[in-house]
Amino acid sequence: MWSKIRSMMEGHPERLRVMRILIENGLGLRGNEVYLNDIEVPVVRIAKSAGVDRRTVDETIRMVETNPELKSLFSNLRSAGLSLRGVAKQLGLGVVEIVVEDPHKPGIIAGASQLFSEMGVSIRQALVDDPELSPEPKLVLIGDKQVPGEIIPRLLKIPGVTRVSVY
């Protein structure tokens, strides 16, 4: 879907930035309004985040409203909810970010989960970007304690994994 959106926005990089902000933050559209689940978000805040003016956000919303496929997507988009990533350090949790060459390849989550289990780390949260909606999808696993650094080379042996970061 993301490649289709990029194609539709060719020649309008500022509108593409607006759409990216909406998708990455799970912001949906209802009529001419932007929502974070049930909370209305002022378009001026979206504009500031995307580095565009308010009119560009309004134009993008109008364009989405006239395209049935985009309207269906954005009218049903909702935030996935709470992420522990930003507070992991304060809570004594470990964070592992995994990037893969082909996000459609099965077995990445299973392989990573197995390694966490072998190291005695319970997964508190798994966050996976949708490869159809995110231009740079990642898998983020948050463990119940700090994740040992020796997991990195083992994760890199999982077929398809190209980069691993432990925080």
Predicted segments with their positions:
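Active-site/ligand-binding neighborhood in enzyme catalytic cores
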Residues: 60
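A conserved regulatory-domain signal marking ACT and ACT-like small-molecule sensing domains
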Residues: 2-33, 63-167
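Short alpha-helical "recognition helix" segments of helix-turn-helix
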Residues: 46-47
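Helix-turn-helix DNA-binding elements, focusing on the entry/boundary residues of the two helices
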Residues: 43
